[in-house]
C-alpha cells in the first residue's frame, strides 16, 4: 500500500494570540493566560503546509493508519496531533518497537496494538505539553516584563530554567573558589 513518513512535529499547541487577540500584546494585566480549552495548529511554513496536505489527503482516503511514531510519550503526542488535525476517521493501530533491527520491525508489524491502548500515554504527553505551555508562556512574559532590559526576552521553561540554574551555580562556585592547603600522604609498604 501507500507509505508515508512524518519527520517532525507539524502541529504544536496554539500560540497565545490564537486564543485571544489581547494576548498578542505582552502585558502584565493579561497574565495569567489560561485558555478555556487548548488546541493545536499547523505550523505556518510552506514546506510543512505542503507536507501536511499530502498527509491529510492520504489519511482521508486510508482504510487503516499505523502510527509508527517513536515508542514513547512524545512520539505518541506528535502523531496523535497530526492525526487529529488531519481529521483521520479510520481505525488506527500502533507499531511499538524500541529496536530498528529487521527482526524487531517485522515482529512489531505482526503484533500491532490498538491505538486506544496508548490513550494514557497520549494524555500524559498532552498534560506535559499543557504544563510546559502554561509555565513557559506565562513565566516568560512575567519575567521579561518585570526584569528584561532593552526588550530582552527572558525565556523560562520547565527544563531550561533549572538547567541554566545548575550552570550559573557551577560558574559561581568556580569564580568563588578559594584554594585551601592540603597534604599528600606517602606510604611505604613492606612485604
Regions found by a protein language model. Give the residues of each.
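Prokaryote-biased recognition of long, low-complexity C-terminal linker/tail segments
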Residues: 128, 132-191
Amino acid at each position: 500500500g501507500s507509505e508515508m513518513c512524518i519527520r517532525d512535529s507539524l502541529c504544536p499547541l496554539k500560540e497565545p494570540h490564537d486564543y485571544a487577540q489581547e494576548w498578542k500584546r505582552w502585558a502584565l494585566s493579561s497574565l495569567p493566560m489560561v485558555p478555556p480549552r487548548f488546541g493545536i495548529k499547523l505550523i505556518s511554513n510552506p514546506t510543512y503546509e505542503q507536507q501536511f496536505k499530502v498527509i491529510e489527503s492520504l489519511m482521508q482516503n486510508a482504510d487503516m493508519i499505523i502510527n509508527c511514531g517513536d515508542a514513547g510519550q512524545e512520539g505518541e503526542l506528535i502523531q496523535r496531533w497530526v492525526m487529529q488535525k488531519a481529521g483521520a476517521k479510520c481505525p488506527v493501530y500502533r507499531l511499538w518497537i524500541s529496536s530498528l533491527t529487521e527482526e524487531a520491525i517485522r515482529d512489531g508489524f505482526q503484533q500491532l496494538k490498538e491505538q486506544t491502548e496508548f490513550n494514557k500515554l497520549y494524555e500524559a504527553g498532552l498534560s506535559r505539553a499543557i504544563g510546559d505551555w502554561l509555565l513557559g508562556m506565562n513565566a516568560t512574559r512575567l519575567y521579561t516584563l518585570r526584569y528584561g532590559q532593552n526588550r530582552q526576552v527572558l525565556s523560562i521553561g520547565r527544563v531550561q530554567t533549572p538547567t541554566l540554574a545548575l550552570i550559573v551555580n557551577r560558574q559561581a562556585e568556580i569564580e568563588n573558589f578559594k584554594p585551601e592547603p592540603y597534604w599528600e600522604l606517602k606510604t611505604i609498604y613492606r612485604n
